[in-house]
């Protein structure tokens, strides 16, 4: 499944952002991070300094980490996954009880900073899911009227 997905990404000419940003419109920039297990992963400050900070800044990070820091730096929205919303019972309870992630699932706001952590549309490791539903997240961004 993973290799089929990676093949589809390559065949579809989809750009994976790894510690880089792309300005989509004059008002929107998306910044993608390398996985936190990568040794040469840039920090959030380096990435935001390289981006146009006069745009709405969306940070994509597989793991929902450094949320307080990202809110202080001025990111507008962080999109993450990784937790699969506790894909397999009882790991969903263990994750919550031992606070194994800064944020496990859903939408959270820190000041003006929004975080969305999705359970994803697939699983990890085992082709089963006994906790947390699969999902696609649809986000509608609307430009504020600044008149």
Task: Identify the role of each PLM range.
Residues 1-147:
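Soluble catalytic domains of enzymes that build or remodel membrane lipids, polysaccharides, and related
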């Amino acid at each position: 499944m993973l290799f089929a997905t990676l093949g589809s990404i390559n065949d579809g000419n989809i750009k994976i952002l790894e510690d880089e940003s792309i300005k989509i419109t004059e008002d929107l920039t998306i910044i993608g991070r390398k996985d936190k297990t990568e040794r040469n992963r840039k920090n959030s400050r380096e990435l935001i300094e390289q981006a146009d900070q006069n745009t709405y800044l969306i940070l994509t990070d597989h793991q929902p980490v450094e949320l307080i820091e990202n809110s202080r730096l001025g990111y507008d929205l962080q999109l993450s996954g990784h937790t699969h919303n506790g894909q397999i019972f009882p790991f969903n309870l263990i994750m919550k009880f031992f606070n194994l992630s800064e944020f496990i699932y859903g939408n959270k706001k820190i000041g003006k900073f929004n975080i969305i952590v999705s359970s994803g549309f697939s699983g990890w490791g085992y082709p089963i899911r006994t906790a947390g539903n699969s999902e696609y997240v649809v986000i509608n961004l609307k430009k504020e009227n600044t008149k």
